Amino acid sequence: MGDSRETHGLNAFVTGYPVKHSRSPLIHGYWLRTLNLAGSYRAVEVTPDDFPAFIAALKDRSSGFVGGNVTIPHKEIAFKLADRPDELSEELGASNTLWLEDGLLHATNTDGRGFTANLDECHPGWDRTDRAVILGAGGASRAVIQAVRDRGVNEIHVVNRTVERAQELSDRFGAQVHAHPMAALGEVMRSAGLFVNTTSLGMENEVAPTIDFSPLAENAVVTDIVYVPLKTPLLAQAEEQGFATVDGLGMLLHQAAPGFETWFGKRPVVDEVLRALIIADMDKHR
């Protein structure tokens, strides 16, 4: 997606409803400063009713934006309104990154790339396993399943309270994705090398269940796409039981990088200074 376009005065956005909570302006603002670029990135709150008009203004360039990020609840409609959604978006039915190119609105979904880049950075070799367990079958699980499958994991077991939701994902992503009810969690965890929580269990004000991680492979990695709190109860449990853990903040940071490079023409770096900046903001808003 990257190119060498002139970066003076380019403007990008994040839109959602609501969008006040988004930390994307902090992330992209940091990269603009450290790379000494003249562009801007800001949050624009758009209601579902107004979203088609927002996209129309983006397409005809009257909005002044070259592209941007899309968050809840607009990801599905952004995919539908794009002129050129890529294969990742097509399979997911949702897009989180938009950009104008040759007069057309292109779309992709970088959530899966953010997920795998976080694991690559924090626990290289995580993808040597043949078996992964994904807890949850909501919208957030789709990109994770897609990314894990595309990295060559042969068996992906989706466990959900409502097994029908998990079955829908199995139908969408192919024969190597298997659906299970919560009662089967312990059984499907046997010898799995990756455990991913994609649910809100363990978020602030959420009571997390106690999970016995011992059926996992000895060198398994447990990760959570939730990053508030940074160490969720599920990660704390896994750590106490001797397993390697990876928090979800890196996914947020890494999923932002492809879009930035597309809009501003420079590849940003996810570093410890950026991570500390976001953690400080999280602490401030507790």
Curated annotation (Swiss-Prot):
UniProt-listed Pfam families: SDH_C, Shikimate_DH, Shikimate_dh_N
GO cellular component, one term: cytosol
Catalytic activity: shikimate + NADP(+) = 3-dehydroshikimate + NADPH + H(+)
Top EC group: oxidoreductase
GO MF annotation terms: NADP binding; shikimate 3-dehydrogenase (NADP+) activity
GO biological process: amino acid biosynthetic process; aromatic amino acid family biosynthetic process; chorismate biosynthetic process; shikimate metabolic process
InterPro entries: Aminoacid_DH-like_N_sf, NAD(P)-bd_dom_sf, SDH_C, Shikimate_DH, Shikimate_DH-bd_N, Shikimate_DH_fam, Shikm_DH/Glu-tRNA_Rdtase
Residue ranges of the TM segments: none
Keyword annotations of the record: Amino-acid biosynthesis, Aromatic amino acid biosynthesis, NADP, Oxidoreductase
Pathway given in the UniProt record: Metabolic intermediate biosynthesis; chorismate biosynthesis; chorismate from D-erythrose 4-phosphate and phosphoenolpyruvate: step 4/7
UniProt-annotated binding residues for shikimate: S22, R23, S24, T71, N96, D111, Y227
Active site: K75
Subunit structure of this chain's protein: Homodimer.
PANTHER family named among the record's database cross-references: BIFUNCTIONAL 3-DEHYDROQUINATE DEHYDRATASE_SHIKIMATE DEHYDROGENASE, CHLOROPLASTIC, SHIKIMATE DEHYDROGENASE
Protein family per UniProt: Belongs to the shikimate dehydrogenase family.
Function: Involved in the biosynthesis of the chorismate, which leads to the biosynthesis of aromatic amino acids. Catalyzes the reversible NADPH linked reduction of 3-dehydroshikimate (DHSA) to yield shikimate (SA).
Protein name: Shikimate dehydrogenase (NADP(+))
